[in-house]
């Protein structure tokens, strides 16, 4: 379903309730953006906007650790497994590395200071020894060798589960298919698949000669090649590989290596036949990290491959183990990026895009400009207030930045008389007094703006459906009020409803939804369950067998859970976690639909804004009609008594999961605990009742022991779920 324009007439809550509401909103927004980026390949915001929201969420959760939940984007590695490739569960998770947002020298100093603080080093202690490496702009890969032979290659995926791409990786000549004698019985090598710039240029030249579509940049070309279902296509793409770490390895006691340092491990990888970047070096303390960052930055354009920063890692593996992890990322490593590349171009127009939630986003239509390996023709302006703050008008010369070297945004207008110019023969921004290298003349930017150019105004009617455009009090975003009546929202509402975490309708992807909505085959969610074989089979690229598969998936999705159904409706501010809380508290959909704001406020983690959103949503007759039609189409779930949640065996308990359990995955353990009424938290505090710890538990286990909180192993968890007093302390 969609959200309505009048969902939030109530004033914002204050104090901790306001913080909880803000955290919940940030999580839901970040999850939507991540789904658009990693699964749909249709990002709606620049990387910089995502990073800002992510950092804001990190800051809030750091200040309010009791509000951290396991399903927060900060507690997991982002990504997704693509359909068509076999899922592979990583035995050792492929964690991401924290990105230092400060691109100056102080970024390296801040990391070094954090490490020294975590290690409790006195000011006069010797410098910490690090390994400094380039940060490759490619696709993370895990190579598993058993008995010295490559048996599996898998992408990062979401960090826990990746994609099996062994058939494609075998075509990469830099990756050895077998290793020399003396390697461990089990060896997982982690690294990056990438494409050299010269190979990328040659590939695009061949594409042009054949009349085929060219690739945007080396990273996209490499990622697309690795994810091919046909390895013959991959073999025609010139891919390369750099190794930079290890996953699962046979323990030293069983014949595995006994490395003392990260640098020593890299040297051993080289001896085993894996390519390691020539720039890798040992650095003593922050000063040498800064020097490395500056040197590699100066060499960046001359390197044969793309990088978007450098990586620092504590060299001592013993210190790495001492520092541990912060669930999502290691404390002993950081990625230190370079300032985003910036160019100058002209604003030729300002268009408006309408998103799934009905948000209207002004987008600058630009004179084409080449920024960071991509020709940019559009850049987001975020919202009307941001546009006015930057004072952007049609005809202006603007600075365009590829935030994170991936997605473009307008930084601001180049003011007249600012002493800036563009380098002749390019759009590179330089000082007007000289050229970039002292040889090419620099042309001053255009003069003052013409006085008759009007300010941009947000349209009063939606450019897609003509419905009224509204802006809620206290919000910066304008929204279309059309809901499901707006085709722009209709498509994304259907995709949201069909996604894996909601109704899980396999095969109902973006291209099929485009045809169904554009062809007026469906107008509302219940129309999905009224589809027939003939209406589907006549669509483009939809043979009878494919159509039947979609119908089977739709039929299968009818049997769901109340939480999934609620999440799938797309009620604003109701994410996956809130939907579960509502289902557990009320037990029945009718009870939720008829609940007043005060009743909704009794639900765990539901504040005034969310309560008002839910109440207003179900107060709309057309929303209730859609729900009733879905039930009439056969969508069903098990319901329980409204008070059942209070009688659950673990009701009121807070449990923290850490480490790797022998047989249960984290999601499975979380589901078991939540179904028993427990709250699964992401951090340990005095309010924690139990900590369930597996292998490599890290700092959470240490904190639990420090606070005297009972620690359970997997057997203890099962005992707790059975209602048997567990034998704490076994982990």
Swiss-Prot record:
<feature type="domain" description="BRCT">
    <location>
        <begin position="645"/>
        <end position="731"/>
    </location>
</feature>
<dbReference type="GO" id="GO:0003911">
    <property type="term" value="F:DNA ligase (NAD+) activity"/>
</dbReference>
<dbReference type="Pfam" id="PF00533">
    <property type="entry name" value="BRCT"/>
</dbReference>
<dbReference type="Pfam" id="PF01653">
    <property type="entry name" value="DNA_ligase_aden"/>
</dbReference>
<dbReference type="InterPro" id="IPR010994">
    <property type="entry name" value="RuvA_2-like"/>
</dbReference>
<dbReference type="InterPro" id="IPR012340">
    <property type="entry name" value="NA-bd_OB-fold"/>
</dbReference>
<dbReference type="InterPro" id="IPR004150">
    <property type="entry name" value="NAD_DNA_ligase_OB"/>
</dbReference>
<dbReference type="InterPro" id="IPR013840">
    <property type="entry name" value="DNAligase_N"/>
</dbReference>
<feature type="binding site">
    <location>
        <position position="133"/>
    </location>
    <ligand>
        <name>NAD(+)</name>
    </ligand>
</feature>
<dbReference type="GO" id="GO:0003677">
    <property type="term" value="F:DNA binding"/>
</dbReference>
<dbReference type="GO" id="GO:0005829">
    <property type="term" value="C:cytosol"/>
</dbReference>
<keyword id="KW-0436">Ligase</keyword>
<dbReference type="GO" id="GO:0006281">
    <property type="term" value="P:DNA repair"/>
</dbReference>
<feature type="binding site">
    <location>
        <position position="480"/>
    </location>
    <ligand>
        <name>Zn(2+)</name>
    </ligand>
</feature>
<feature type="binding site">
    <location>
        <position position="337"/>
    </location>
    <ligand>
        <name>NAD(+)</name>
    </ligand>
</feature>
<dbReference type="InterPro" id="IPR004149">
    <property type="entry name" value="Znf_DNAligase_C4"/>
</dbReference>
<comment type="similarity">
    <text>Belongs to the NAD-dependent DNA ligase family. LigA subfamily.</text>
</comment>
<dbReference type="InterPro" id="IPR036420">
    <property type="entry name" value="BRCT_dom_sf"/>
</dbReference>
<dbReference type="InterPro" id="IPR018239">
    <property type="entry name" value="DNA_ligase_AS"/>
</dbReference>
<feature type="binding site">
    <location>
        <begin position="47"/>
        <end position="51"/>
    </location>
    <ligand>
        <name>NAD(+)</name>
    </ligand>
</feature>
<dbReference type="InterPro" id="IPR001357">
    <property type="entry name" value="BRCT_dom"/>
</dbReference>
<feature type="binding site">
    <location>
        <position position="156"/>
    </location>
    <ligand>
        <name>NAD(+)</name>
    </ligand>
</feature>
<feature type="binding site">
    <location>
        <begin position="96"/>
        <end position="97"/>
    </location>
    <ligand>
        <name>NAD(+)</name>
    </ligand>
</feature>
<keyword id="KW-0234">DNA repair</keyword>
<keyword id="KW-0235">DNA replication</keyword>
<feature type="binding site">
    <location>
        <position position="465"/>
    </location>
    <ligand>
        <name>Zn(2+)</name>
    </ligand>
</feature>
<keyword id="KW-0479">Metal-binding</keyword>
<keyword id="KW-0464">Manganese</keyword>
<dbReference type="InterPro" id="IPR041663">
    <property type="entry name" value="DisA/LigA_HHH"/>
</dbReference>
<protein>
    <recommendedName>
        <fullName>DNA ligase</fullName>
        <ecNumber>6.5.1.2</ecNumber>
    </recommendedName>
</protein>
<feature type="active site" description="N6-AMP-lysine intermediate">
    <location>
        <position position="135"/>
    </location>
</feature>
<feature type="binding site">
    <location>
        <position position="486"/>
    </location>
    <ligand>
        <name>Zn(2+)</name>
    </ligand>
</feature>
<keyword id="KW-0227">DNA damage</keyword>
<keyword id="KW-0862">Zinc</keyword>
<feature type="binding site">
    <location>
        <position position="192"/>
    </location>
    <ligand>
        <name>NAD(+)</name>
    </ligand>
</feature>
<dbReference type="Pfam" id="PF03119">
    <property type="entry name" value="DNA_ligase_ZBD"/>
</dbReference>
<comment type="function">
    <text>DNA ligase that catalyzes the formation of phosphodiester linkages between 5'-phosphoryl and 3'-hydroxyl groups in double-stranded DNA using NAD as a coenzyme and as the energy source for the reaction. It is essential for DNA replication and repair of damaged DNA.</text>
</comment>
<keyword id="KW-0460">Magnesium</keyword>
<dbReference type="InterPro" id="IPR001679">
    <property type="entry name" value="DNA_ligase"/>
</dbReference>
<keyword id="KW-0520">NAD</keyword>
<dbReference type="Pfam" id="PF14520">
    <property type="entry name" value="HHH_5"/>
</dbReference>
<dbReference type="GO" id="GO:0006260">
    <property type="term" value="P:DNA replication"/>
</dbReference>
